[in-house]
C-alpha cells in the first residue's frame, strides 16, 4: 500500500556468524550524526530512550521552529535488549575522537561516551552510536536489527515565489520516533508485504529486460528525487543535485 511504501525509514538486519571453533563475544554498531537543519546545524539534542520493547537514540533540533523546512527529527532504534551506546564522542581533542573510539570500542565492544541527553553548540553536529552485543557459540548465527527513521515534515518551494507546506509524512507522523515505533510494531506485516511484492514482480512473465529496467530504477522512490504533497499527491523532480532538485514539475518525459 502507498502509505507503508512511503515510510521514511531504513531497516538494517545484520547477520553475524561465528566461523571459529571458540565462543565469540561481539558488537555490531551504527553511528548517526545529528545534522538536522543542515546547513544551519547546531542546538540539536541527542537523547536515549528505553520503552521496554525497544530502545535507542532520538535526535531533535531546538534551533528551528516546527514550521520551518529545516525542522525535523531522526531515530535509531532496535528491539534487541543487550546494547551499548553513547550520545557523542568522549571529551577529548577533536583529532583524537575517532582514534579513541576505535581503541576503546575495538577492545571492549562497549561505548564509553556520554549517556545523558546532550544539546550541541551552534554550528556543531554530535555523532551518536548504538551497538548491539551478541555471544555466539561455534557455528552459531544471529541477526540483529536496527531501524533508522527520519521525518522532515515541511516542504519548501524555494524556486520562484517561496512557499512552505506540510509533506504527506508530516500529516501522518509527529516524529521520527513514532515512525520507527510503527515499523517495529508491524515488522512482520511490512516484511511480508515487501517480500510478496518482490516475489510477484520477479516471477512475472514480463521480459527480463523490462524486469531489469523497472527494478534497477525502483530505488529512486526512496530518495529526495520524489516527495508526496500534503494531500498525498506524488511529486517528482527530473533528478537531484547535491542540495536541490533538478527540473521541477513531474515532467512527462521522465515520469510517464
Question: Which role fits each region the language model picked out?
Answer:
Residues 7, 110-133, 140, 144-147, ...:
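Substrate-binding groove/exosite segments of carbohydrate-active enzymes
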Residues 1-107, 130, 157, 161-208:
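Polysaccharide-binding surfaces and accessory modules of carbohydrate-active proteins
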Residues 20, 138-140:
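Short loop/turn positions at the edges of beta-strands in beta-sheet-rich folds
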Amino acid at each position: 500500500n502507498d502509505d507503508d511504501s512511503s515510510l521514511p525509514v531504513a531497516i538494517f538486519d545484520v547477520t553475524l556468524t561465528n566461523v571459529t571453533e571458540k565462543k565469540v563475544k561481539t558488537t555490531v554498531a551504527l553511528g548517526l550524526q545529528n545534522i538536522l537543519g543542515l546547513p544551519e546545524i547546531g542546538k540539536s539534542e541527542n537523547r536515549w530512550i528505553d520503552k521496554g520493547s525497544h530502545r535507542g537514540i532520538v535526535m531533535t533540533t531546538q534551533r528551528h521552529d516546527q514550521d520551518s523546512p529545516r525542522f525535523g527529527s531522526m531515530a535509531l532504534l532496535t528491539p534487541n535488549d543487550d546494547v551499548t551506546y553513547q550520545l557523542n564522542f568522549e571529551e577529548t581533542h577533536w583529532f583524537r575522537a575517532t582514534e579513541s573510539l576505535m581503541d576503546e570500542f575495538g577492545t571492549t565492544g562497549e561505548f564509553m561516551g556520554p549517556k545523558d541527553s546532550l544539546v550541541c553548540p551552534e554550528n556543531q553536529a554530535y555523532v551518536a552510536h548504538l551497538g548491539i552485543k551478541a555471544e555466539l557459540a561455534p557455528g552459531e548465527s544471529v541477526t540483529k536489527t536496527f531501524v533508522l527513521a527520519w521525518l522532515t515534515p515541511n516542504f519548501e518551494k524555494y524556486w520562484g515565489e517561496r512557499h512552505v507546506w506540510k509533506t504527506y509524512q508530516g500529516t501522518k507522523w509527529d516524529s521520527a520516533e513514532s515512525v520507527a515505533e510503527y515499523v517495529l510494531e508491524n515488522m512482520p506485516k511490512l516484511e511480508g508485504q515487501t517480500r510478496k511484492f518482490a516475489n510477484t514482480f520477479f516471477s512475472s512473465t514480463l521480459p527480463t529486460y523490462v524486469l531489469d529496467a523497472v527494478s534497477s530504477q525502483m530505488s529512486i522512490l526512496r530518495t529526495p528525487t520524489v516527495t508526496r504533497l500534503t494531500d498525498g499527491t506524488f511529486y517528482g523532480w527530473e533528478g537531484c543535485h547535491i542540495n536541490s532538485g533538478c527540473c521541477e514539475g513531474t515532467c512527462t518525459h521522465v515520469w510517464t
